[in-house]
Amino acid sequence: MDNETPTPQPVLSNDNSSETAATAGAPKRILLVEDDNELASVYLTRLQAEGFDVRRVANGEDALAAALNYKPDLVVLDVMMPKVSGFDVLDILRNTPETADLKIIMLTALGQESDKQRADALGANDYLIKSQVVITDVIERIRYHLSQVD
């Protein structure tokens, strides 16, 4: 009889993007959902410089797929986008078991109180109005929400 303990074998996956950011030392994953290419480029560059692993998509339909496949720690979500609005994306993510607990920051041009109330009712963690914040404010809110334990 062989008394050796078998060596555990790693679980193989065809999709490296499914690895969780909970791995020790791994950068936090941010899904940036923004249809404005210029603004998205600025945010993408700055967030990467801050040490985040960032994936950007330009519409709500792609955001839903990326939330499931990329498994972000936090989503920065525009509201007014082609195909599926940010409000609809938020609603779907909150009602999907795999994404229900995602941290979601709405970053939008919509400044009406009714829009903020709608985002709150749908479960947004934060609601930032583009004209009232600078990128350092957004990074501060991202860090805050990532530091919160569920």
PLM features: residue spans?
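Non-catalytic signal-transmission and effector/linker regions of two-component phosphorelay proteins
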Residues: M1-R29, T136-D150
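Conserved acidic carboxylate
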Residues: E34
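Charged docking surfaces used in two-component/phosphorelay signaling
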Residues: S41-A49
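Helix N-cap/capping motif at the beta->alpha junctions
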Residues: R56-A65, G86
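Active-site beta3 strand of CheY-like receiver
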Residues: Y70-V76
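The feature encodes the CheY-like receiver
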Residues: P82, A100, Q112
